[in-house]
């Protein structure tokens, strides 16, 4: 069994050197991701496609491979195929017939062929021959070229016939690391998750910068969002997660800054700090989730004033998106439930915010800050490899317990993603098992029976530890981590 990875059309339009570089990078990215699923994964690059071979003795890996490929930037779509050899057009038909006889019975169908290589026939001739045979010697209703119920997709390359058994849509975009790195400001809300994802999809290695305004609970929640985005869409490359203790800045704003200017001043301080951190990391651009007119600090006038605080390029991919469109995208990429349970701290700072800030007035207000405030904040910022989030949680999860056995009055919660749970169901005789995906746990845990103890389970124990710590920070103490 094989997968044929089709390149995103924008890659195909590049010049030959650029196209080769992008394709080679995509091959490397695919290999990096799939090797974590199985060491025997084979990835081979061609001019216009990339082949992925599922080990013959491990056909069960096909679904896992397909799911991972669907989340790798730079891929238009993936087709799962079975491989056959052929000697003639009739030989092709004879091999297609037993595979599709039952599938097209009582249905309309058509045959579509894509061919590469030198042959004494063309694609249309194969479509007519195979389609005619299937129409004559099966119980199909007939051929329908437009909107058929079943499409028989065949690909021919040299003397090999590939029958397409499944088509998986890809992310599109460019392969990771074909663009320069960016530093994304992430709060855990709807907007910042989507803006981060859009730059991952565009091929930029996206590092995360979090301004902590709400203590450990806020940081844990944001780390879950960042880890989810990286693990799902950007796992092929290492990135950094930078946590900035921003409470001192907020304290000085509340104490010293005019109420109407607070929101704009806060954003300017964030941009200054992020720019300093980005420069240290060799990054040339900051990404934010700001959308025009969404809140008072996001008017054109205020955004202009905010941008004047630094020479660093500030990118706003959501600038013209409606809020509902952002939420819909948030739901699609799997960060909606995180965002729903994430507290919002920035919105309470200014009671009567200005929508037309004057640069001179803002700069005058900023002279009230302690001279070394930004320097102190930058020095206190902590940057970690995002892969270390799980290890870091291990050192902070002393308040909870990891268990291997299950006692009475304990319920196991399988927090894996639905498709992962379906592929490998957790079954424990005599034990109640609830299935609540990790991204819904924060919003649904409060509805559970508080008299019971809940054991969180996931395959590797990473997300279960993050979720346990998050729930403990929220005041729940009837939670443990289950590691059988």
From Swiss-Prot:
SUPFAM superfamilies: Adenine nucleotide alpha hydrolases-like, Rhodanese/Cell cycle control phosphatase, THUMP domain-like. GO terms for molecular function: ATP binding; CCA tRNA nucleotidyltransferase activity; tRNA binding; tRNA-uracil-4 sulfurtransferase activity. It catalyses: [ThiI sulfur-carrier protein]-S-sulfanyl-L-cysteine + a uridine in tRNA + 2 reduced [2Fe-2S]-[ferredoxin] + ATP + H(+) = [ThiI sulfur-carrier protein]-L-cysteine + a 4-thiouridine in tRNA + 2 oxidized [2Fe-2S]-[ferredoxin] + AMP + diphosphate; [ThiS sulfur-carrier protein]-C-terminal Gly-Gly-AMP + S-sulfanyl-L-cysteinyl-[cysteine desulfurase] + AH2 = [ThiS sulfur-carrier protein]-C-terminal-Gly-aminoethanethioate + L-cysteinyl-[cysteine desulfurase] + A + AMP + 2 H(+). Its EC number is 2.8.1.4. One of its GO terms (biological process) is thiamine diphosphate biosynthetic process. Its main location: cytoplasm. One of its GO terms (cellular component) is cytosol. The keyword Transferase applies. Keywords: ATP-binding, Cytoplasm, Disulfide bond, Nucleotide-binding, Redox-active center, RNA-binding, Thiamine biosynthesis, Transferase, tRNA-binding. Signal peptide: none annotated. Residues 63-167 form the THUMP domain. The keyword Hydrolase does not apply. Residues 406-484 form the Rhodanese domain. CDD domains: PPase_ThiI, RHOD, THUMP_ThiI. It is found in: Cytoplasm. HAMAP family: ThiI. This is tRNA sulfurtransferase.
């Amino acid at each position: 069994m094989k997968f044929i990875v089709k390149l995103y059309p924008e890659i195909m339009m590049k010049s030959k050197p650029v196209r080769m570089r992008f394709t080679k990078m995509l091959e490397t990215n695919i290999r990096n991701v799939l090797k974590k699923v199985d060491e025997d994964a084979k990835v081979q690059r061609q001019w216009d496609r990339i082949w992925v071979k599922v080990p013959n003795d491990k056909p069960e890996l096909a679904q896992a491979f397909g799911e991972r490929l669907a989340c790798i930037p730079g891929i238009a779509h993936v087709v799962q195929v079975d491989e056959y050899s052929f000697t003639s057009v009739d030989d092709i038909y004879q091999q297609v017939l037993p595979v599709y006889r039952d599938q097209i019975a009582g249905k309309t169908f058509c045959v579509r062929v894509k061919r590469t290589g030198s042959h004494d026939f063309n694609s249309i001739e194969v479509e007519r021959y195979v389609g005619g045979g299937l129409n004559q010697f099966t119980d199909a209703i007939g051929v329908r070229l437009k909107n058929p119920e079943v499409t028989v997709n065949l690909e021919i390359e040299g003397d090999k016939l590939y029958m397409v058994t499944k088509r998986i849509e890809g992310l599109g975009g460019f392969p990771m690391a074909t663009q320069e790195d960016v530093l994304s400001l992430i709060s855990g809300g709807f907007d910042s998750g989507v803006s981060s994802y859009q730059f991952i999809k565009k091929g930029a290695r996206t590092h995360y910068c979090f301004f902590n305004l709400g203590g450990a609970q806020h940081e844990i929640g944001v780390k879950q969002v960042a880890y989810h985005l990286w693990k799902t869409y950007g796992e092929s490359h290492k990135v950094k997660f930078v946590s900035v203790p921003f409470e001192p800045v907020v304290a000085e704003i509340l104490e010293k800054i005019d109420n109407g200017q607070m929101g704009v001043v806060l954003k300017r301080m964030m941009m200054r700090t992020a720019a300093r951190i980005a420069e240290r990391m060799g990054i040339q651009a900051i990404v934010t989730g700001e959308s025009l007119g969404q809140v008072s600090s996001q008017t054109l006038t205020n955004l202009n004033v905010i941008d004047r605080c630094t020479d660093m390029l500030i990118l706003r991919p959501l600038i013209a998106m409606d809020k509902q469109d952002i939420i819909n995208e948030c739901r699609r990429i799997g960060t909606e439930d995180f965002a729903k349970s994430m507290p919002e701290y920035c919105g309470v700072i200014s009671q009567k915010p200005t929508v037309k800030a004057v640069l001179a007035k803002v700069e005058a207000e900023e002279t009230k800050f302690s001279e070394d405030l930004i320097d102190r904040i930058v020095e206190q910022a902590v940057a970690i490899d995002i892969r270390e989030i799980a290890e870091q949680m291990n050192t902070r999860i002393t308040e909870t317990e990891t268990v291997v056995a299950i006692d009475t009055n304990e319920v196991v919660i399988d927090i894996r993603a639905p498709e992962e749970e379906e592929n490998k169901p957790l079954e424990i005789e005599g034990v109640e098992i609830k299935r609540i995906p990790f991204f819904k746990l924060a919003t649904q845990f409060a509805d559970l029976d508080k008299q019971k103890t809940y054991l969180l389970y996931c395959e590797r124990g990473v997300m279960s530890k993050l979720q346990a710590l998050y729930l403990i920070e929220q005041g729940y103490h009837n939670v443990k981590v289950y590691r059988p």
